[in-house]
Swiss-Prot record:
Subunit description: NDH-1 is composed of 14 different subunits. Subunits NuoA, H, J, K, L, M, N constitute the membrane sector of the complex.
Enzyme kind, highest EC tier: translocase
The organism's taxonomic lineage, starting at the top: Bacteria, Pseudomonadati, Pseudomonadota, Betaproteobacteria, Nitrosomonadales
Subcellular location: Cell inner membrane
Swiss-Prot/TrEMBL GO biological process terms: aerobic respiration
One MF annotation (Gene Ontology) recorded for this entry: quinone binding
Keywords from the named record: Cell inner membrane, Cell membrane, Membrane, NAD, Quinone, Translocase, Transmembrane, Transmembrane helix, Ubiquinone
Identification of the protein by name: NADH-quinone oxidoreductase subunit H 2
Length: 366
């Protein structure tokens, strides 16, 4: 990296060299994040259909293959779906606000991509290593709901507008619980930097991870993440049995696809962030060989993959909650639990080190 920076300085001069090097570096990092993310989203849809198919005692997609190879049956399905979506027409209803109708999917997808800027894949692999990384992600994930509200209003449809209102209320309700759960992580790590949060979980084994002292907060965060991404059993914003398809009922073609790109990108983001702040990020479960020989980003991907499997497991297992049940869970269960845990955590942190040493609390409170 230093050699490349020096090369840019020699070729473009000391005035333009460093700036151009930084520009090229950031563009390459963005491409290195966005392209694998889009591929991961495509094959997450395939994995969802296959896994839920097996859970329901059926096969799932098994026809579309590469070059007619039988044992790769189904693996080309995401590519076929993408080609079909690109070729379909985007139909705009006659009574819709055309500008906002087209803009809404972009406003939903852009924050879902922007949030990935601060995700650390290993100690040195992060696009923007900022001190307020956790706060930045919370802000980006909150902005996606504006696109959903605009989509519901611009569609000029009662079904779409009702779905958008449901989604807005749901996101506001669970954003509070998620924020309070992240406050507990902030109190323990004393930092909003995601890299520092992972380093605060370093130790001999997974006993040092924040999952153990903050297990209720992990459950609150993860379930709130499922609710924020409008996934089953919290998918009342799309409730097919009640309001046809919710806020994207009038969308087709690539505009419809962009909403799902945002949804699945946010799913992967929630799983990645939970792995970083509760499951040690790139740290191995045991700090001995052969676990330490595995690259850190592999551990991060494995942890996130398990949490993504839980997303799919929920969809195949639980029926959809009623709207009032979702609101009750957020306001009367999750928010009080997180507030109590913040108070308890604050009291424990004020205990003298000698008292904390009598219990295994010094594993997490340094």
């Amino acid at each position: 990296m230093e050699y490349a920076q020096q090369l840019f300085g020699d070729f473009f001069g000391p005035e333009w060299g460093p700036a151009l090097f930084l520009l090229v570096k950031n563009v390459l990092l963005i491409v290195a994040i966005v392209l694998p993310l889009m591929l991961a989203v495509a094959y997450l849809t395939f994995a969802e259909r296959k896994i839920i198919g097996y859970m329901q005692l059926r096969v799932g997609p098994n026809r579309v293959t590469f070059f007619g190879i039988p044992w790769l049956g189904g693996w080309a399905q995401p590519i076929a779906d993408a080609v079909k979506a690109v070729m379909k027409e985007i139909i705009i209803p006659s009574g819709a606000n055309k500008v906002l109708f087209v803009l809404a999917p972009i406003l939903t997808f852009a924050p879902a991509l922007a949030a990935w800027a601060v995700i650390p894949f290993s100690p040195d692999v992060v696009l923007a290593d900022i001190n307020a990384g956790l706060l930045y992600i919370l802000a980006m994930t909150s902005m996606g709901v504006y696109g959903i509200i605009i989509a519901g209003w611009a569609s000029n449809s009662k079904y779409a507008f009702l779905g958008a209102m449901r989604s807005a209320a749901q996101v506001v309700s669970y954003e509070l619980a998620m924020g309070f759960a992240l406050v507990c992580v902030l109190m323990m790590s004393q930092s909003l930097n995601l890299g520092d949060i992972v380093k605060g979980q370093q130790g001999a084994s997974m006993l040092n991870w924040y999952l153990i002292p903050l297990f209720p907060m992990f459950l609150v965060y993860f379930i709130s993440g499922v609710a924020e991404t409008n996934r089953a059993p919290f998918d009342v914003a799309e409730g097919e049995s009640e309001i046809v398809a919710g806020f994207h009922v009038e969308y087709s073609g690539m505009a419809f696809t962009v909403f799902f790109l945002a949804e699945y990108s946010n799913m992967i983001l929630v799983a990645m962030l939970a792995s970083i702040i509760f499951l040690g990020g790139w740290l191995p479960p045991v700090n001995v060989a052969p676990f330490t020989l595995v690259p850190g980003f592999i551990w991060l991907i494995l942890k996130a993959s398990f949490l993504l499997f839980c997303f799919l497991w929920f969809r195949a297992t639980f029926p959809r909650y009623r709207y009032d049940q979702i609101m009750r869970l957020g306001w009367k269960v999750f928010i009080p639990i997180t507030l109590v845990w913040i108070v308890v955590l604050g009291l424990v942190m004020q205990l003298p080190a000698s008292i904390r040493g009598a219990f295994p609390l010094n594993l997490w409170f340094h």
